């Protein structure tokens, strides 16, 4: 993405800067795929992207350049939902991932075991995936053990 709208003057350093994060991430993914000795395809480049990439992709400045096309991937996006809601969910998932990576508690509130945040995030992620591919959750349920583990742990807490 080399559009002029991605160039701005950084007030702190008083220099023109180009926001080429998306371009750099795509090129990095292509290089990584090629180094594995496999054909670089659109699907592989997409699969290689991080939550940071998707967060930037759905930010206003990049989204506007693509004239709303990124939302078309969400075949079952609920009425009234759009770029902002999608990006808000990506941010929440990224925050959850970061909390887990930094060993922060996700199942405790006031030193008591509480799975409400985890359950809410599970529902949010499940819904999000369903908006892209409605048949995904029945397929994932065969290998998904999240709800069973939460139920088991909640039952332990009640004893």
Question: Model-found features: residue ranges?
Answer:
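Amphipathic alpha-helical interface elements
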Residues: 1-159
């Amino acid at each position: 993405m080399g559009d002029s709208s991605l160039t701005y003057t950084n007030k702190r350093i008083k220099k023109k800067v180009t926001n080429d994060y998306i371009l750099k991430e795509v090129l990095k993914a292509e290089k990584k795929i090629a180094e594995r000795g496999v054909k670089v395809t659109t699907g592989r480049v997409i699969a290689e992207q991080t939550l940071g990439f998707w967060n930037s992709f759905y930010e206003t400045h990049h989204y506007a350049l693509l004239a709303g096309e990124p939302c078309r991937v969400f075949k079952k996006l609920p009425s009234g939902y759009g770029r902002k809601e999608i990006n808000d969910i990506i941010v929440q998932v990224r925050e959850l991932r970061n909390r887990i990576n930094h060993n922060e508690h996700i199942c405790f509130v006031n030193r008591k075991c509480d799975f409400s945040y985890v359950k809410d995030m599970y529902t949010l992620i499940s819904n999000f995936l369903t908006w892209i591919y409605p048949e995904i959750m029945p397929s994932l349920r065969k290998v998904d053990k999240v709800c069973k583990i939460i139920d088991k742990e909640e039952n332990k807490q009640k004893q």
